[in-house]
């Protein structure tokens, strides 16, 4: 390192030098990136979940699976969601009872929300959820899809960041943060996502275009099945001067 490099910030004031911070350009492990800065959804869809290092960071019950998007020259694109008799949903025995669509404007976000797990009365929440997702995770017939809301999400336009946090009792509170591409951005990040009840999830629009998503739910929508957590980001408050004016009598 040259003398010049050692005194690189000599031209700044003392206060400015104290305030300086350096960006960390190191690429962390998958576990670090998944919980902090986020990873491409395609990396998760391609991951071998049988490996211990993947199992240790994956939220039980979450599914992230690749979708094929076919460009049709001079027309647009064509993409499949799911097939009833093959793929992830067929494997886990989940077929939505309701399908819906949503549009999120650019620069907007959907705050954390969560759906309540259905717990049989003869057992505790901790024991039941550990049985479903730790002790007997391949026994999909145990899952009470008709009594709790599971979400299946697809993005057909734009780019979005999804953040999941497991808040189920009896399970580790893991975090999964990843980026999904809509069908108009053909890439390995064109995926479908399954979110179990008890896993809080938030969505933030990336970039300058609106996000359009299509999602299915294992039950018909019921307002009491949706709990909000840290969702203040959804409220666009009026300017203070407007609020003062409206409060005048």
Model-inferred region functions:
Residues 162-163, 193, 201-206:
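Short beta-strand His + acidic residue motifs that chelate non-heme Fe in jelly-roll/DSBH
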Residues 3-189, 208-212, 217-249:
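Non-catalytic, conserved peripheral segments adjacent to functional cores
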């Amino acid at each position: 390192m040259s003398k010049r490099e050692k005194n690189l910030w000599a031209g700044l004031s003392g206060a400015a030098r104290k305030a300086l911070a350096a960006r960390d350009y190191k690429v962390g492990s998958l576990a670090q990136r998944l919980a902090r800065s986020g990873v491409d959804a395609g990396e998760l869809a391609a991951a071998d979940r049988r490996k211990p290092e993947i199992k240790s960071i994956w939220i039980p019950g979450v599914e992230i699976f690749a979708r094929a998007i076919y460009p049709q020259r001079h027309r647009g694109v064509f993409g499949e969601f799911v097939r009833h008799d093959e793929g992830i949903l067929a494997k886990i025995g989940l077929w939505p009872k309701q399908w819906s669509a949503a549009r999120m404007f650019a620069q907007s976000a959907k705050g954390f929300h969560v759906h309540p797990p259905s717990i049989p009365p003869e057992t505790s929440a901790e024991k039941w959820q550990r049985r479903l997702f730790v002790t007997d995770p391949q026994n999909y017939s145990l899952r009470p899809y008709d009594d709790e809301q599971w979400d299946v999400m697809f993005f057909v336009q734009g780019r979005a960041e999804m953040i999941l946090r497991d808040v189920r009792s009896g399970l580790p509170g893991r975090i999964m943060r990843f980026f999904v591409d809509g069908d108009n951005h053909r890439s390995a990040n064109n995926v479908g996502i399954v979110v179990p009840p008890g896993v809080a999830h938030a969505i933030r629009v990336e970039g300058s275009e609106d996000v359009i998503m299509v999602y299915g739910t294992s039950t018909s929508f019921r307002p009491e099945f949706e709990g909000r957590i840290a969702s203040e980001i959804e409220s666009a408050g009026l300017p203070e001067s407007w609020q003062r004016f409206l409060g005048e009598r």
